[in-house]
Regions:
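Exported/extracytosolic protein signature
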Residues: 1-285
Length: 285
């Protein structure tokens, strides 16, 4: 909304007398809101944004352009853009009716042109953006995203903001290694399970992590360690020497959170995973 002031003058007998100053407010004909379907983001999932435009005026607004800064922020004297438009995801509705796909320039900034909002009506835009290498992922970080709409029919651009917060969660993967690759009956075999966490939150006992496997060939005389510390059967793991079925007790495995660093030269973020290692050694039956 824009404020305006106005003052009159009364002139008589060569004298000018000013009136008081009145102040008013010019209501915007077009209003905008911006929302995200999910208020949290991760490195692997796109964010769907919803833009709603409402025209309270008596005339249609045509030739409008939406500009989205995709969360651009300053870092180290440079502008970094943490979101990338997902090609082909833009959808455009007028009074709830689907329209032809609008003209989109991915940017950054993202621009969508040729928009119209009927008199007394509304238009809705939906599109997706994916966090990229400039999106911070450590716990507590946010992306502030601004969209604005401009056009010849508008005295001023209208804009709306939306903030999304990085999701706090562990993100786990497991790798299995065998040593040696060739073994004879009666020889020793070692399985090493490496569990990595690229998430910003440690995997604690509350997550009830468990590793299960069926060893073939079956192993006897098992020794098990976790991060170098010896484990005890029943307390930490179970093993059926007849079937080869092995399982850790749920909650015994924990994995620290990843650490994140931002490259001073490029502004890109990288993650160093938190790592835990489970080692199982036995004799081939």
């Amino acid at each position: 909304m824009a404020a305006f002031t106005n003052q009159a003058a009364l002139t008589y007998n060569g004298v000018t007398i000013p009136s008081n100053i009145v102040t008013g407010e010019l209501l915007e004909t077009l209003t905008i809101t911006k929302d995200a379907l999910d208020s949290q983001y991760t490195a692997a999932s796109s964010v769907t944004y919803i833009i709603n435009l409402i025209n309270s005026g008596a005339a249609a607004l045509t030739g409008l352009t939406l500009t989205d800064n995709l969360g651009a922020y300053l870092s180290g004297g440079r502008t970094l853009t943490p979101l990338s438009y997902v090609s082909g995801t833009a959808r455009y509705y007028v009074n709830g009716v689907a329209q032809a796909a609008p003209d989109v320039t991915a940017g950054p900034p993202l621009t969508i042109t040729g928009l119209s909002v009927p008199a007394g009506g509304n238009a809705t835009l939906l599109y997706e953006a994916l966090p990229n290498q400039f999106a911070p992922l450590d716990a507590g970080r946010t992306i502030l995203n601004t969209a604005s709409v401009s056009g010849a029919a508008l005295p001023n651009a209208v804009e709306a903001e939306q903030t999304i917060t990085v999701r706090r969660e562990p993100v786990l993967r497991i790798r299995k290694a065998l040593s040696p690759a060739s073994v004879s009956p009666g020889g020793q075999l070692t399985y090493t399970f490496t569990i990595e966490n690229t998430g910003n939150t440690p995997a604690t006992a509350a997550e009830l992590l468990a590793v299960t496997d069926t060893f073939d060939p079956i192993l006897s005389g098992l020794t098990v360690s976790f991060n170098g510390a010896a484990w005890a059967p029943t307390t930490n793991y179970t093993y059926n020497a007849t079937t080869g079925a092995f399982a850790t007790v749920a909650g015994q495995i924990t994995v620290p959170a990843a650490t994140y660093t931002q490259n001073a030269a490029t502004g890109e973020w990288s993650a160093t995973p938190g790592v835990s290692t489970l080692t199982v050694t036995g004799t081939v039956a």
